[in-house]
Design a protein with these regions (language model features):
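Substrate/ligand-engaging "lid" and interaction regions
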Residues: 2-8, 14-400
């Protein structure tokens, strides 16, 4: 029997707990997390709740009740949970997502054998474009050839705008289950992705054209965030927090200009979804949120993982490709991106991101081949961009 007031969430990480679990848990749902961290699993099962610390002008806290957890290594229990849950959510990142979807498929198949009339909706709380098709293909590969995936499984893409900083180790030692987050609490998701009625949850914001909103998140929010980190680090490598570099008017104005250039592109690409004034207001709000001192978001966290953030379909190149498609200027976006090739920020313990160090060394060895072989740039389609980046790379620390 399906429990319509239960959500199973793959990933008891920062977004899973501070956002998805919090929205559903505080709306009367039973929340079941699937995770690999034994400390988190044991803690959730013991306390049956956890605390979300809201960081802002006035600190607040939310206690999320009615919570439990299952180890991702307990395949049978995970399949059973999937088969009986009212709705699923995943927040694990692309690499892990690829590994868990086959288990979800097994749960879907079991569910269908018990109750073929009750479809399963899966909220894809991932920062990736085309997440629904990515998951759909893996489901198809792991279900019987005649399984009605498109009729029985709803794949709901999202635009995750909530900012969640790294929690200091001293805080985790005192309270392992706590998560920090900003007050922003709107989950934008695909209204057309649901097979069952959309849950009546405060904070859900269904949209009819989710692609536009996913691109807005990537090409304004993520783009601006990374721009502030990369340019801020270039000018102020000694600083730790994002709000600190945004106190420099030069960093602030350049970040805003880059975001506005991307807004121009988005308005051209999605005229039925956005106006420039809408996006300008969104940018102003985002910059205020980026400057939230209480959040203590580090330059390291915002800029780290260069291979992903400078990749061929992420925040910079994705917006550049859209600009190329509509013959729109993207020079500021390109310049902002170029600062990322010199980003060497370290965490508060003085440690860098391991894969970033390897990537930066590969750039020094052969810049152009690193763009094509590691970041996935197309040597033909992206040739004009590659040529400009080569020129910018030869001028390290150039000031805008």
């Amino acid at each position: 029997m399906v429990n319509t007031k239960q959500i199973v969430i793959f990933g008891a990480g920062k977004i899973g707990r501070s956002f998805i679990g919090q929205l559903f848990g505080c709306s009367g749902y039973e929340v079941v997390f699937i995770d690999v961290d034994p400390v988190i699993i044991a803690g959730l099962n013991e306390k049956k709740s956890y605390r979300v610390a809201i960081k802002g002008n006035i600190d607040q806290e939310i206690i999320v009740p009615n919570v439990s957890a299952i180890s991702a290594f307990d395949r049978d229990k995970v399949i059973e949970a999937v088969s009986k849950s009212g709705i699923l959510a995943v927040s694990v990142g692309k690499n892990v997502l690829e590994r868990i979807v086959p288990v979800i498929a097994a749960g879907v198949e079991k569910r269908y054998s018990m109750d073929p009339e009750v479809p399963l909706d899966i909220i894809l709380a991932e920062n990736m474009r085309s997440a629904a098709e990515f998951v759909r293909q893996i489901l198809i590969q792991n279900l019987p050839l005649d399984f009605v995936v498109d009729e029985y499984v709803g794949l709901i893409e999202t635009s995750i705008g909530k900012m969640v900083p790294i929690i200091p180790q001293t805080e985790l030692e005192k309270e392992p289950l706590v998560v920090f987050a900003e007050a922003y609490n709107m989950l934008i998701l695909d209204a057309k992705g649901f097979k069952s009625p959309i849950p009546q949850i405060k904070g859900l914001a269904p949209k009819s054209n989710i692609k536009a909103w996913v691109d807005r998140k990537a090409f304004i929010h993520n783009l601006g965030h990374a721009t502030a980190a990369y340019y801020g680090y270039t000018l102020h490598p000694e600083l730790v927090y994002l709000y600190e570099v945004l106190e420099d008017p030069e960093v602030l104005l350049f970040t805003r200009a880059v975001m506005l250039q991307s807004a121009d592109i988005l308005v051209t690409a999605y005229p039925d979804d956005f106006t420039f004034s809408d996006l300008e207001a969104h940018i102003n709000d985002l910059i205020n949120r980026f400057r939230n001192k209480a959040l203590k978001d580090t330059i390291f966290r915002v800029g780290m993982d260069l291979v992903r953030k400078l990749g061929h379909d992420d925040r910079f190149m994705g917006s550049i490709h859209l600009g190329m498609q509509y013959k729109m200027p993207y020079d500021l976006i390109l310049k902002a991106m170029s600062f990322g090739f010199f980003f060497k920020a370290k965490d508060e313990g003085g440690t860098g991101f391991t894969s970033d160090s390897k990537f930066l060394k590969s750039l020094e060895k052969n810049f152009e081949s690193s763009l094509t072989e590691i970041l996935g740039y197309d040597p033909v389609i992206d040739h004009p961009v590659i040529e400009k980046l080569i020129g910018l790379y030869k001028q390290p620390g150039v000031i805008v």
